[in-house]
Amino acid sequence: MAGLHGPELLERYNRSLMGVFGTPQRVLVRGSGCTVWDADGKEYLDLLAGIAVNALGHAHPFVTSVVSSQLATLGHVSNFFTSPTQIALAERLLALSGAPAGSRVFFANSGAEANEAAFKLARRNSAPGAGGKPRTRIVALENAFHGRTMGALALTWKAAYREPFEPLPGGVEWVAAGDADALRAAVDETVAAVFIEPVQGEAGVRGHPEGYLRAAREITRDAGALLVFDEVQTGVGRTGSWFASEGVLPDAMTLAKGLGGGFPIGALIAFGEDVSTLLAAGQHGTTFGGNPVATAAALATLHTIESQGLLEHARRAGAAVAAALGALDFVTGVRAHGLLIGFDLAAEIAPAVVRHALDAGFIVNATGPGTVRLAPPLIVTEGQLLGFVDALPAIYAAATSEETP
């Protein structure tokens, strides 16, 4: 592959890969820490971390060594067998989440797969309530994003994502995000589960009012519905805590993205014996989920986050960049949850800002016409973040000029 450049590789990409992502912005060939390089030798500061995946940056030496060692020892065993790393990771996640006795973990390969498992878990909560009516409804939130596989897509709010693939699994309805009264009005004994992202990343990094998650816990408990937190984007330290659930224990929680430090893995944690036994033997499964290499990578990632104090660092660095962004006159709003940050622009030119940021050597993304998201590796320095803020006025000016007729 030596000597090949971006345009040639992108031409080959367009001839050989499905166009579901459009044409990639660059061909990346190498990464180290928070920096990546493209096929033409240009260097970029990665402030997106593969969409909140590379929690420890690129080619982290400890994760790399653990994965290499595990792959050289035992790579895959199927679901007929288990491995020490799979068991150890399940135990670690149960401990970190404060899981009560009887809680259990199911491993998958992605966030969408974890949410598919949670959807099936919810369907199993079908026993009629006191009034004798079957539990056929599932409630999700407006602006929610839970994935693009069929069950996860059925939970996702945006009609443009869903409509080309209808009919989807039925019985899903949406209520206004952050509105406890709307949730209370919607949830009764016919509801099997309520799905909530503690912070809606794809909606522009939007959290909920204080007390909302606790109210959701009370509402679902009273109705006999499961409360499922989708922490695919927010979990594993992204927001400066292991989880973004504000101390509220749901009935189930999904994880992925940063869990493997760049290696594909997802997880569903079911809390308590009653919930963890809803899915019986043979009712769900996966070939690759929880394989020795992925679980070893996740254990190494969790160890590094804890041993290097990255939860506190995420809180501190996130607050610093949020304050700096808020001081810019063209930034009209900032929402920072640790190192998951969304900021709004005075003009709806976020896609152009993203393009010019890339030209300037920064990887960020737009979650809407006027909102830019940052989700850098948890090892990013305040200096690197503030360097982006320093460059942002020129980037914004270039984007404004592009959008001006």
Language model feature labels by segment:
Residues 1-405:
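Conserved N-terminal phosphate-binding loop of PLP-dependent enzymes in the Aspartate aminotransferase
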